[in-house]
Amino acid sequence: MTVTAPATNAPRAVPVISPAPLLPPADFGPVDRLQGWAMTAVIAALAAITRFFNLGSPTDAGTPIFDEKHYAPQAWQMLHNSGVEDNPGYGLVVHPPVGKQLIALGEAIFGYNAVGWRFSGAVCGVITIVLVARITRRLSRSTLVGGIAGLLLIADGVNFVSSRTALLDGFLVTFVVAAFGCLIVDRDQVRARMHLALLDGRIAETPWGPRLGVRWWRFGAGVLLGLACATKWSGLYFVAFFGLMTLAFDIVARHQYRVPRPWLGALRRDLGPSLYALVVVPFGVYLASYAPWFASETAISRYEAGRSIGEDSLLPIPDALRSLWHYTYGVYRFHSGLTNSDGNHHPWESKPWAWPMSLRPVLYAIDTENVSGCGAQSCVKAVMLVGTPAMWFVAVPVLGWALWRSIVRRDWRFAAALVGYSAGFLPWFIDIDRQMYFFYAATMAPFLVMMIALICGDILYKPGVNAERRTLGLIAVSCYVALVITNFAWLYPILTGLPISQSTWNMQIWLPSWR
């Protein structure tokens, strides 16, 4: 005899309706450490090969090319003049010292030659690529997406040329990307501390939420931003943008962890330490970079107090600082005077609206006389700073996707990358009359790459798709990365000064504005 259970009417499942936003998941960074470091090692090796191979070529008959002609000699002067430049005859000592000090390190090792004045820039180029791979891995929580970002930056023409020439922008890129990475780690660390406070029941002890303790990653970001400003003044833009970004991170974290008054909590608990870490610390680092200038008896404008500026001061400011201010103001006047309306023009200048798609690159060097080695009667050797079109030509849809993800989907990863990109782009519209060049966009390249890699991650890891669609996504991303690498390989001769035929040179110049 079979006994059956009495029929029962199972109650319908009641949907859970949360009266408040759900708490964020306990996700504070990638967990696949071994795979992450293996990816990093591969990316670093590829970056080193591309950045250091044939680093000493080309030159202008053994001398620097383009604006290397300013910075390589000034760095050499620093080596032999107690850390300061000794030849201001042309009035072109118009940037802070850190970038030139780094160039001088390479010259101290290898001497006054192309490898010497480019070595430090190549090292920083490799570091930047590794940083972008690691940062994108942390943003996406995917080692694969981080590796894609590293490959894309390796194959970017702007980053490639910036890493292999002794200009200051490559160093600036390294410092701002490193500072950005520190603030991303700081964001994860803040959320880990907020999570511990939640578990301990300390979230609502006060209306403003818990104190978050010493935040060393944010302090490190301040040091790096100070070094950025001590390389080029445009580092100040990143101080402002990154400062607002990290404060926004804090407000959102306090809101998501249900702090009763998150805005006031961020202002009360976080604003003061943020100002210290991202304003006071960078200013201190900037002043410290002038230590050789303060110690010198012959540095430019070192003893202006009592000469071109009076001995008396309304405030008890040391004469050395007053002299530095006088020198700084003179540099500011130099830069502010480089305007088109005053008759300052350059055949390769450009305006910022042309930068996102690399519409007006910069020709660093060209030689068409007595050049051989291309297998044709007429050969060309040229170095052009130009973005790899497979990435830069899609900048507008990439930015559109990033804005949509940031605003509509509230995806903080794209928002953070947009902040970095905007810091390198938007401030240049303030004075559009100023003489500007595409190499100013070098700071935009890493953040463009991050956004492209994050889009690749969206395609690879789109939730709710079947295996067939996932495979198609993998194929699409693989084809795109292969396209970028192929495009870079095609442009390689005009990024490195290899001899090519005149017909090949004409094929390399894709747009009329590239001429």
Where are the model-predicted features located?
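Transmembrane-helix motifs of polytopic, lipid-linked glycan transferases
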Residues: 119-140, 178, 397-402
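Short acidic/glycine- and proline-prone juxtamembrane loop motifs at membrane-interface regions
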Residues: 121, 161-171, 231-234
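Membrane-interface transmembrane helices that cradle and orient dolichyl/undecaprenyl
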Residues: 12, 179-217, 247-257
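Aromatic-rich transmembrane-lumenal/periplasmic boundary elements in polytopic membrane proteins
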Residues: 52, 57-80, 266-267, 271-274, ...
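Extracytosolic helix-loop segments that constitute the early lumenal/periplasmic catalytic or substrate-binding loops
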Residues: 52-58, 63, 67-101, 105, ...
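Transmembrane-helix signature of polytopic, membrane-embedded enzymes
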Residues: 39-43, 132-155, 174, 192-200, ...
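Transmembrane helical bundles and short interhelical boundary loops of multi-pass, membrane-embedded
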Residues: 2-8, 209-217, 225, 244, ...
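Start-transfer (signal-anchor) and selected internal transmembrane alpha helices
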Residues: 1-53, 269-282, 470-479
